[in-house]
Regions:
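Loop/turn-to-beta-strand initiation segments
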Residues: 18-22, 46-52, 79
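N-terminal phosphate/diphosphate-binding loop that engages ATP/GTP or pyrophosphate donors
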Residues: 1-31
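Conserved catalytic-core segment of NTP-binding enzymes
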Residues: 3, 31-37, 41-47, 56-157, ...
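Short His-Asn-centered micro-motif
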Residues: 25, 53-56
Length: 172
């Protein structure tokens, strides 16, 4: 799935890549996606210093309210990093959020209300699924201001940046 990143789809491939500092692993799933890796996350944690697991998606939207069964957090997880897209700020909740009705209810807002740092913080605090936050897509002064405002509403480590632009800054 990542052209410049080695990807192990089997245990044998994973063993062959054991010396690589950064890899992708998973089992092929329909639609060109990857699902659970060929070995347990506990085994991966034994081999690598850090294992980053994408717990669930957001149907391409920058904000999300999680269903009761989400995210599936592996028992071996030591940290829970929530990634939020800055491109959702200012958009109506119904356009920016996956599961917009639940998002609006958690935020105490209407579906047509814009997503603000305050509404995003309200959703995150209500769900309590994170212990640190990364705000991606911080590519404009407006996005950086929203990131800084979001950080003021949270009590955990918060970083922001743009993976596209290669910019990163810790805010809290």
């Amino acid at each position: 799935p990542f052209p410049d990143l080695p990807c192990a789809r089997t245990a044998a491939e994973l063993n062959a890549l054991a010396g690589e500092p950064l890899i992708c692993t998973g089992t092929d799933a329909p639609g060109g996606k990857l699902t659970v890796p060929p070995v347990s996350l506990t085994e991966l944690a034994r081999i690598y210093d850090y294992v980053l697991v994408e717990a669930d998606g957001s149907a391409g939207r920058p904000m999300k309210a999680h269903a009761a069964h989400e995210p599936v957090i592996p028992p071996a997880a030591r940290r829970r990093l929530l990634v939020v897209g800055a491109s959702g700020f200012g958009l109506p909740i119904e356009k920016a959020a996956h599961r917009p009705e639940r998002y609006a209810a958690l935020a105490g807002a209407a579906l047509t209300d814009p997503v603000t740092p305050q509404t995003q913080a309200a959703v995150m605090l209500a769900e309590n699924l994170h212990d640190s936050v990364y705000l991606n897509q911080a590519e404009t002064p407006t996005a950086w201001a929203a990131a800084e405002e979001l950080a003021r509403h949270l009590e955990c480590p918060v970083a922001a940046g743009s993976l596209h632009q290669g910019v990163f800054r810790r805010l809290r």
